[in-house]
Design a protein with these regions (language model features):
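Active-site clefts of carbohydrate-active enzymes
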Residues: 212-213, 246-247, 261, 276-312
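Active-site mouth of glycoside hydrolases
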Residues: 50-263, 267-274
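Short acidic, Pro/Gly- and aromatic-enriched capping/linker segments at domain boundaries
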Residues: 37-57
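Aromatic- and carboxylate-lined catalytic core of secreted/periplasmic carbohydrate-active enzymes
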Residues: 37, 296-298, 310-447, 458-482
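Bacterial N-terminal signal peptides
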Residues: 15-29
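Short strand-edge motifs at loop-to-beta-strand transitions and within beta-strands
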Residues: 453-455
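Bacterial N-terminal signal peptides that target proteins for export
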Residues: 2-18
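Signal peptide processing junction and immediate N-terminal pro/mature segment
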Residues: 28-36
Length: 482
């Protein structure tokens, strides 16, 4: 995110207390604790790739739907007590992923934290390279044990609440100058340090980059990759992804990252189906997910669009019907924890994300194939967007189906009649309209519908929120879940 922030939160506990605590943690070798700390993560992490390469599974091979929030600025903004409050809230709302937490926070997104310290003023590094004493000259080969003990504890608190944590080892909005000042060898060494330290935590994955706009510069790309390579040299198990340029990109747009990553993240402020399908169709095949789009309560994009519940809802359903395996939600107040964030944590968008999770978790979402050839939905599709189309203005209808003909799912962002080729289903089907604003179903009269010919479907009016978007669910008779 490229929003400029001020007024860092005041620590609630005296700095001296935290410093003593951090040293005690280090001296008792926190890293020796079991990486599955917390009953919420037992038997789940680390996540891995499914046998067909299309989605994540846990350690029991159960499909893992990414339901992520994005607390990027947590290390620079929150006390441990605040972090636990936040994690507990996210667990209660059905989140299973924190994607992502920056190792250290400084630069354009954190202008009030010039030294990238924790709220109680612990620096991430203890020395500087030649040329200056600001954060861009931190010596990456001199990590501060007290600081990283704090990050250890944050990861363990997340594990306690069943949360997978994507760690950004050195985000690239503010820290590219630091990498340039350190050079390739130090960047690789820093990655090795992180790999050794965090390979013992099961609930970890890695998110490299962050608005990495200069990835086409081979020197910058090599520096960011050096950190990732260093991590992987010590820890080949935990998965990596990378966020490339704003405003639209996919991880695999830079093919040199392909050997390093296992997840293809989509970044877009345009209608999400466009870039999601681009990601889904890239090779090598990887799980695709919505890495970053509009955050709730924040205007972003070019042209800008405000993150209303309707906008983030469209992005969520378009994603899942365009090859997605989940998404990172975001919120203006909780990606950076600006003052007042506690009053903006349980929003309409979070409630509707919980509804989204419940809906797709009731289905074999991992088997959905995007209806790119329009053989399932043959009419009423609306207009395919452009990169300048605002999410709030796009009326494009997305659809997906399971290869065995059990389900066809259609998302309509605006009211219209759609035509479905009923032969896409293996048997006569039960048809329901799902309201994405309150999670209720409305049966389509006259069912079950024969699986022959074409059938038109029209939504039953306004949804509970007073908007026009609905989900059409067609489930073949005998389907296991509906």
């Amino acid at each position: 995110m490229q929003t400029i922030l001020t007024n860092c939160r005041t620590a609630r506990i005296p700095a001296a207390v935290f410093a003593v605590f951090a040293m005690l943690v280090a001296s008792t070798q926190l890293l020796a604790a079991p990486p599955q700390a917390g009953s919420g993560s037992a038997g789940v992490y680390p996540v891995k790739i499914s046998s067909n390469g299309r989605y994540l599974v846990d350690q029991k091979n159960v499909p893992f739907l990414i339901v992520g929030d994005t607390p990027q600025g947590l290390m620079g903004r929150l006390t441990e007590a605040q972090a636990e409050f936040y994690f507990a809230d996210r667990q209660a709302h059905g989140f299973n992923t924190m994607g992502w937490i920056d190792v250290a926070c400084a630069g354009p997104d954190y202008r009030d934290n010039k030294e990238a310290t924790t709220p109680d003023r612990i620096r991430p590094y203890t020395g500087f390279v030649a040329g200056g004493t600001d954060f861009t000259h931190y010596d990456l080969t001199k990590p501060n044990e007290a600081y990283f003990a704090r990050l250890d504890h944050v990861v363990m608190l997340a594990a306690k609440h069943g949360l997978l944590v994507f760690i950004d080892p050195i985000e690239t909005i503010g820290w590219l100058p630091t990498l340039r000042n350190n050079g390739l060898a130090s960047a690789y060494s820093y990655g090795q340090y992180l790999g050794r330290r965090y390979k013992r935590f099961a609930n970890v994955a890695w998110l490299n980059g962050n608005d990495f706009n200069s990835w086409k510069d081979p020197k910058d790309d090599a520096l960011v990759q050096a950190v990732a390579k260093g991590i992987k040299s010590e820890d080949p198990v935990h998965l990596h992804s990378v966020e490339l340029n704003v405003h639209t990109s996919s991880s695999l747009d830079d093919p040199t990252w392909a050997p390093l990553i296992a997840l293809n993240g989509t970044y877009t402020y345009s209608p999400t189906y466009m870039q999601m399908l681009h990601s889904y169709n890239q090779t090598p095949v990887m799980p695709t997910y919505l890495l970053e789009a509009h955050y709730e309560l924040e205007p972003v994009g070019d042209p800008p669009d405000f993150g209303t519940p309707s906008v983030v809802r469209r992005e969520e359903y378009w994603t899942m019907l365009s090859g997605g395996t989940g998404q990172f939600y975001g919120n203006k107040y909780t990606w950076s924890f600006v003052p007042g964030w506690e009053s903006h944590i349980d929003t309409v968008g979070v409630t509707q994300l919980t509804i989204w999770k419940k809906f797709f978790s009731s289905l074999p979402w991992q088997n959905l194939i995007p209806d790119q050839d329009h053989k399932a939905v043959t009419a009423g599709l609306g207009t395919w967007g452009t990169f300048q189309t605002r999410v709030s203005q796009s009326d494009y209808c997305t659809a997906a189906k399971t290869p065995d003909g059990s389900y066809v799912i259609v998302y309509l962002p605006t009211a219209r009649t759609v035509t479905v080729n009923m032969a896409s289903l293996k048997a006569s089907a039960h048809a329901k309209w799902f309201d994405p604003t309150n999670g209720t179903y409305t049966n389509v009269p006259g069912g079950p519908v024969a699986n022959t010919g074409a059938r038109q479907f029209t939504p039953p009016g306004k949804n509970h929120e007073g908007a026009d978007d609905w989900v059409l669910l067609l489930a073949a008779s005998g389907s296991s879940r509906h």
